[in-house]
């Protein structure tokens, strides 16, 4: 019976127009975040939820979850400011990381000298499958922690981007086993 209900819910959601799909997903996002036990703010007008989560033991950052132009976005600023002289290495590391990311992308803002990680998915895909909201948020959070660690190693320890990426790939191999 549960499968039938899920199938009927999917069929119904497929018939909704884009505005109704966005409205339905927004309600589910709010419900999900209200059930969680972390500080968050819900901004109705912007259809954005901001949650403060720990990237490291000593550093928390604001993660944003938004609905914009038919897309579901997960975004976090990994590095708020980096030394200008490290710009070439920041770009090299960003390029390497974008090549190994399964979804989402790392971007660098040269004016603000910050680094962000964003996942963007179609609203309909996120709406159709139960658990996708949690899965997206969880995956975004786990990857953001790893990316933040990579950029921190570059900035604080002045480690070469190639070595940082090699260590990430090695740890991913271990996790797969």
State where each predicted segment sits.
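Short, internal acidic amphipathic alpha-helical interface segments
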Residues: 77-118
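Charge-rich, low-complexity N-terminal segments
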Residues: 1-62
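Short, surface-exposed charged micro-motifs
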Residues: 39-41, 64-66, 105-107
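Short, highly charged C-terminal tails/helix-capping segments
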Residues: 152-177
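A conserved amphipathic terminal alpha-helix motif
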Residues: 133-155
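Hydrophobic residues embedded in beta-strands of well-ordered beta-sheets
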Residues: 47-49, 72-74, 113-115
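Well-ordered alpha/beta subsegment
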Residues: 108-134, 156
């Amino acid at each position: 019976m549960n499968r039938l209900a899920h199938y009927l819910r999917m069929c119904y959601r497929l018939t909704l127009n884009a505005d109704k799909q966005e409205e339905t997903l927004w309600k589910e996002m709010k419900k999900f975040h209200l059930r969680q036990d972390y500080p968050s703010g819900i901004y109705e007008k912007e259809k954005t939820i901001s949650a403060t989560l720990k990237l490291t033991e000593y550093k928390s950052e604001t993660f944003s979850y938004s609905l914009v132009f038919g897309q579901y976005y997960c975004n976090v600023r990994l590095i708020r400011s980096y030394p200008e002289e490290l710009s070439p290495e920041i770009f090299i590391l960003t390029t390497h990381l974008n090549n190994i990311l399964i979804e989402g992308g790392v971007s660098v803002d040269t004016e603000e000298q910050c680094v962000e990680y964003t996942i963007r998915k179609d609203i309909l895909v996120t709406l159709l499958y139960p658990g996708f909201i949690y899965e997206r948020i969880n995956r975004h959070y786990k990857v953001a922690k790893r990316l933040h660690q990579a950029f921190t190693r570059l900035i604080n320890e002045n480690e070469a981007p190639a070595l940082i990426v090699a260590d990430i790939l090695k740890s991913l191999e271990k996790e797969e086993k």
